[in-house]
Amino acid sequence: SETAAEKFERQHMDSYSSSSSNSNYCNQMMKRREMTDGWCKPVNTFIHESLEDVQAVCSQKSVTCKNGQTNCHQSSTTMHITDCRETGSSKYPNCAYKASNLKKHIIIACEGNPYVPVHFDASV
């Protein structure tokens, strides 16, 4: 079955697409990455940077996660990301999203050995 690290990659990594995504991008990617199976995931962030650069965040600044855990890390540089948010008219199975292209610091949770990203916490 899928590991937490693999799930992070499926849900959040899109290294090779340009960061100039639109709502069409979100609608396709949310479906392609299986986040509209059984329900519409309300919000999801895709990161347009190399996996290596995102994994490196695990050794950058430690911050507290939203849930109070202490294994979150904030990227030292800003990263190109796309926020996909469900629109008001979205209704399963016709999930609909709007895209925001942003350049922000990401905050991710890391765990394991090797110490790798397992959860996207926030962007700041």
UniProtKB/Swiss-Prot annotation:
Its main location: secreted. GO terms for cellular component: extracellular region. Residues 1-23 are annotated as: Disordered. Substrate binds at K7, R10, K41, P42, V43, N44, T45, K66, R85. It catalyses: an [RNA] containing cytidine + H2O = an [RNA]-3'-cytidine-3'-phosphate + a 5'-hydroxy-ribonucleotide-3'-[RNA]; an [RNA] containing uridine + H2O = an [RNA]-3'-uridine-3'-phosphate + a 5'-hydroxy-ribonucleotide-3'-[RNA]. Residues 1-13 have a biased composition (Basic and acidic residues). Disulfide bonds join C26-C84, C40-C95, C58-C110, C65-C72. Changing K103Q: In 25% of the molecules. The keyword Disulfide bond applies. GO terms for molecular function: lyase activity; nucleic acid binding; ribonuclease A activity. Pancreas. The active site is at H12, H119. Keywords: Disulfide bond, Endonuclease, Hydrolase, Lyase, Nuclease, Secreted. Its EC number is 4.6.1.18. It is found in: Secreted. It holds the Pfam family RnaseA. GO terms for biological process: defense response to Gram-positive bacterium. It comes from the Eukaryota. Monomer. Interacts with and forms tight 1:1 complexes with RNH1. Dimerization of two such complexes may occur. Interaction with RNH1 inhibits this protein. Endonuclease that catalyzes the cleavage of RNA on the 3' side of pyrimidine nucleotides. Acts on single-stranded and double-stranded RNA. Belongs to the pancreatic ribonuclease family. This is Ribonuclease pancreatic. It comes from Camelus dromedarius (Dromedary).
